A protein has these predicted regions:
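Formylglycine-dependent sulfatase
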Residues: 1-122
Length: 122
């Protein structure tokens, strides 16, 4: 499952050992504890600069975000891809669900990334 798999990849531990079970919901109060060792923290201690791009889904509160877990740069979604109103074809759609409007900010659709690569953007 999403959050649990990411926690294991970031820490090298079973997800339950670092307090992550299943997929974190938008109202979750937990996340990847900043005291937990991550591959990014390990690499940073050895002189590497770390970046992560894409979906994080290991906690949306400040203390759980990528920059508090060893990464120097981050670009992506904090939660799941279904947590903001964009159609899978990349078309901005109106979101009518009241719980989603309360839980997530309305984000703009990112355009003009076709045929671009991260080394050209960042």
């Amino acid at each position: 499952v999403c959050s649990a798999s990411r926690a294991s990849l970031m820490t090298g531990s079973y997800a339950e050992r670092v307090g992550i079970q299943g997929a974190l919901s938008p109202w979750a109060v937990n996340g990847l504890d900043p005291e937990t060792e991550t591959i990014a923290k390990l690499l940073k201690r050895h002189g590497y600069t770390n970046a992560i791009f894409g979906k994080w889904h290991l906690g949306h509160r400040y203390e759980y975000l990528p920059l508090q877990n060893g990464f120097d740069e981050y670009s992506g979604l904090i939660c799941s891809n279904d947590m903001w109103p964009v159609d899978f074809d990349g078309i901005q759609i109106a979101d009518t669900s009241s719980w989603r409007k309360k839980s997530y900010p309305q984000l703009p659709l990112i355009k003009d990334f076709d045929n671009n690569y991260s080394n050209l953007i960042f």
